[in-house]
Each structure stands twice: as structure tokens, then as C-alpha cells.
Amino acid sequence: METNYSVIFMTIINFCILVAILKHFFWDKIKGIINERQDFVDEQLLKVDEDSEKARMYLLENQRILQTAKEEGKKITESQKEKANKVYDEIVEDANEEAKSLLERAKTDIQREKEKAEYEIKKQAVDLAIELSIKALEENIDESKHRELISNFITKVGM
């Protein structure tokens, strides 16, 4: 196969003419489109960087707010816990005072009932002694009868 230099030369000249025509009519438009696209991509990258920075700032702010809310929640919880403990202590103290009061009233009631019972026993003893004296005065009592009356008296008194 033989190389035809004239065909190669003409092809190169045709190519150069084609490039010159394309450059003259289309190169500026293509370059403008490429530059617009590059500018758009650069703007988008800047916007992404700005949005990323804003998102990071919002994240930090939200973390700070969340931490503050946690601390406030903890303070509120502690405050309510302290109030509950105070109420509990007051309730226990009131219950203890009420129990002491009931105990004192019970002791007073017991003492009163004891005194009442002692009074009744003394009254019965006096009544029995009077009754015994009346019987002794009504009858002539011999010693065995006297012992029997005393024994009955002791039995009734409960000694």
C-alpha cells in the first residue's frame, strides 16, 4: 500500500479549515456554556459549604439547647424530689405526733378507767364494810360467825 501524501495534506488542510470555521462560529458559545457550567458548579459548591457550615452551627446550637434542657430537667427533678422528701418527712412527723397524741389519750383513758375502777372497788368495800357493820350490830356475833363475815367480805372485795 502506497502512501498518498497529497490526500494526507488535503485532509489536514480540510481539518484546519473545519476547526477555523467551528472556532469562528461555535467556539465562543461552547466556551461560554462551559464557563457557565463551571460557575454554576462553583456556586453550588460554595452553597453546599455554606449550608454545611449552617447545619454544623445548628447542630451545635441544638446540642447546647438539649444540654441546657437536660440540666433544667435534672434541676426540676431534683427540686420535685426534695419537695416530695419534705412532704414525706412532714407526713411522717405528723403521723408520729398523732400516734403520740393517741398514745397519751389512751394512757389518760386507761388511767381514768383505773381510777374509776379503784373508786368502784373502794365504794364496794365501803358498802360491804357498812353492810358487815350493820349485820354485826344486828346480831350478836360469835367468833365463828365473825370469821365467816370477814371471809365473805374478803371474797367480795377480791383480796
From Swiss-Prot:
Compartments, record wording: Cell membrane
Any one GO CC term of the record: proton-transporting ATP synthase complex
Pfam families reported in the protein's UniProt record: ATP-synt_B
Stated name of the protein: ATP synthase subunit b
Topology within the bilayer: Single-pass membrane protein
InterPro entries: ATP_synth_B-like_membr_sf (IPR028987), ATP_synth_b/b'su_bac/chlpt (IPR002146), ATP_synth_F0_bsu_bac (IPR005864), ATP_synthase_B_chain (IPR050059)
Gene3D superfamilies in alphabetical order: F1F0 ATP synthase subunit B, membrane domain
Cited function: F(1)F(0) ATP synthase produces ATP from ADP in the presence of a proton or sodium gradient. F-type ATPases consist of two structural domains, F(1) containing the extramembraneous catalytic core and F(0) containing the membrane proton channel, linked together by a central stalk and a peripheral stalk. During catalysis, ATP synthesis in the catalytic domain of F(1) is coupled via a rotary mechanism of the central stalk subunits to proton translocation. Component of the F(0) channel, it forms part of the peripheral stalk, linking F(1) to F(0).
Keywords annotated in UniProt: ATP synthesis, Cell membrane, CF(0), Hydrogen ion transport, Ion transport, Membrane, Transmembrane, Transmembrane helix, Transport
CDD domains to which the protein is assigned, alphabetical: ATP-synt_Fo_b (cd06503)
Family per similarity comment: Belongs to the ATPase B chain family.
Chain segments annotated as transmembrane: 7-27
Complex and partners: F-type ATPases have 2 components, F(1) - the catalytic core - and F(0) - the membrane proton channel. F(1) has five subunits: alpha(3), beta(3), gamma(1), delta(1), epsilon(1). F(0) has three main subunits: a(1), b(2) and c(10-14). The alpha and beta chains form an alternating ring which encloses part of the gamma chain. F(1) is attached to F(0) by a central stalk formed by the gamma and epsilon chains, while a peripheral stalk is formed by the delta and b chains.
GO molecular function: proton-transporting ATP synthase activity, rotational mechanism; proton-transporting ATPase activity, rotational mechanism
